[in-house]
């Protein structure tokens, strides 16, 4: 009797492997639950939401130092001051920082490329704004 049970179990296991039937695939087949549809509709990506709100400009409250590389004269010193000096209520708040005359000129030159939205936890956790771990 014990051998019969072992053989039946082995046969069932082999059939399941051959036919590709598993617990995950069985669960994947039953995704017609209305609760899952509601949960999927509520999922949103904080980074994408911020990009849409910023309207193509760089958001001073949610970008890292490396984003300033595209503006000559801002990376790394002025960019670090700006990132560490936030959060800001307006782009002009950057001018309240302790900046040299040259740094003020450089910021004024590129000021139209920036905007300010509320800081988002998903984009400001840890030290990612200072060092995002991307190296050349």
Swiss-Prot record:
Superkingdom of origin: Bacteria
Topology class, membrane: Peripheral membrane protein
GO process annotations (BP): photosynthesis; photosystem II stabilization
InterPro entries: PSII_PsbU
Cellular component aspect of the GO annotation: extrinsic component of membrane; photosystem II oxygen evolving complex; plasma membrane-derived thylakoid membrane
Keywords on record: Electron transport, Membrane, Photosynthesis, Photosystem II, Signal, Thylakoid, Transport
Annotated localization: Cellular thylakoid membrane
Gene3D superfamilies to which the protein is assigned, alphabetical: Photosystem II 12 kDa extrinsic protein
Leader sequence segment: 1-28
SUPFAM superfamilies: PsbU/PolX domain-like (SSF81585)
Family: Belongs to the PsbU family.
Subunit comment: PSII is composed of 1 copy each of membrane proteins PsbA, PsbB, PsbC, PsbD, PsbE, PsbF, PsbH, PsbI, PsbJ, PsbK, PsbL, PsbM, PsbT, PsbX, PsbY, PsbZ, Psb30/Ycf12, peripheral proteins PsbO, CyanoQ (PsbQ), PsbU, PsbV and a large number of cofactors. It forms dimeric complexes.
Function: One of the extrinsic, lumenal subunits of photosystem II (PSII). PSII is a light-driven water plastoquinone oxidoreductase, using light energy to abstract electrons from H(2)O, generating a proton gradient subsequently used for ATP formation. The extrinsic proteins stabilize the structure of photosystem II oxygen-evolving complex (OEC), the ion environment of oxygen evolution and protect the OEC against heat-induced inactivation.
Name of the protein: Photosystem II extrinsic protein U
Originating organism: Synechococcus elongatus (strain ATCC 33912 / PCC 7942 / FACHB-805)
């Amino acid at each position: 009797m014990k051998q019969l049970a072992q053989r039946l179990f082995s046969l069932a296991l082999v059939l399941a492997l051959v036919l590709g039937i598993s617990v995950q695939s069985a669960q994947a087949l039953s995704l017609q639950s209305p609760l899952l549809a509601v949960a999927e509709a509520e999922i949103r990506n904080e980074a994408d939401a911020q990009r849409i709100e910023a309207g193509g400009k760089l958001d001073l409250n949610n970008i890292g130092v490396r984003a300033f590389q595209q503006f000559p004269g801002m990376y790394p010193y002025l960019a670090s001051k700006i990132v560490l000096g936030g959060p800001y209520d307006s782009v002009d708040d950057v001018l309240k920082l302790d900046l040299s005359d040259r740094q003020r000129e450089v910021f004024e030159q590129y000021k139209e490329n920036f905007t300010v939205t509320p800081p988002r936890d998903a984009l400001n956790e840890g030290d990612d704004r200072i060092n995002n771990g991307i190296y050349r």
